[in-house]
Amino acid sequence: VKIKSVKFEKTYYRYFEPFTISLGTHEDQENIEVRLELEDGTVGLGEASTLFVISGETVEIMMQAEKTVQEMIVKEDVESYGKLFSRLQQLRATPAIKAAVEFAIIDAFCKRIGIRPYQFFGGAKDHIETDLTVGIMDLEKTLKKVKKIYEDGFRVIKIKVGKNFKEDVERVVESKKIAPQAMFVVDANQGFTPKEAIEFANILHSERVEVVVYEQPVNRYNIEGLKLVRFNSPYPVAADESVFTKYDALRLIKEEAVDFINIKLMKSGVSDALAIVHLAQSAGVQLMIGCMGESSLGINQSIHFAAGTGAFAYHDLDAHLSLDEKTFRGDFRQEGPHIYL
């Protein structure tokens, strides 16, 4: 069955509260919804979501890719998705669009043959567990938020750091007292020098904070710095912003720079994300999966990918919970940290 049309539409969401990371503060989120229709009327949906400070993409840049995408895939057979994915590799400047279009193709294909996307990816699991993220905020607000997250049943709590060393130490250490059985993902979003990153980790370790992933402590291009932190930190170190493509992943694996890679469909697209899964599994590097500013429609893509591959030790798929959405549009059910397909 041939693809009849593909259209992009801008969508806009407000955050329930301003979301701050070491790279800046966000109060709203503009995404792009991709709607792909087959000649038999079957519709596949995808969503592109990005943060300019991380990927360099803007909504305007992404919208400009619409005509290019139409020329690449309209009038082509949806069953030949491998051929279409190869063409979409040309969208190097807009990986989030590549992800959304690839997923829309998969969504339409799955509806055609009567399966769900997680089954397309392998059907490894039909249930995953996510963490919940605490942005950079003052100590009092941090602890109030951590207490609520912990009481809501989340076993893994992600805390953003990297803006103020002393305050960040206090926020994480005090959070552990509020949530004594919780495991923590600590994400600096490139906010530290290697020396600071090592010192930060050692202080937390001396306070017996259980950090299961220490995410992107240093600048994304500082691979030597990442490696230095990895070999001098008591915690497993993850690359996030350092890995967009399968080639980035291969380089980090060869350099032995990280324990974990954080895959985001919005950085890699579906096809490169699958390649990174296989690379990491071959090399014994662990995986987590994260998100940008997706609504329930966009986070749905990563949930199906994560459950279907069953490849991830930790899931950070919580962006939709921070956005003021009028309508829930995911093909999943969520109870606290538990996501069911």
Task: Place the predicted regions along the sequence by residue.
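Active-site beta->alpha loop and helix N-cap motifs at the rims of alpha/beta catalytic domains
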Residues: I115, V134-L143, K148, F165, ...
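N-terminal small/glycine-rich loop or linker at the start of catalytic domains
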Residues: K111-I136
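Structured beta-strand/loop patches that form or line metal/cofactor-binding pockets in enzymes
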Residues: V1-L45, S49-F52, E325
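Catalytic core of soluble alpha/beta enzymes
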Residues: I159-M292, S296-G298, E325-Q334
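Flexible C-terminal active-site loop/helix
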Residues: K4-Y15, N31, M292-L341
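Metal- or metallocofactor-binding catalytic centers and their adjacent structured scaffolds
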Residues: I3, E37-R112
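Active-site mouth loops of central-metabolism enzymes
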Residues: H127-K141, V161-G162, T193-P194, A238
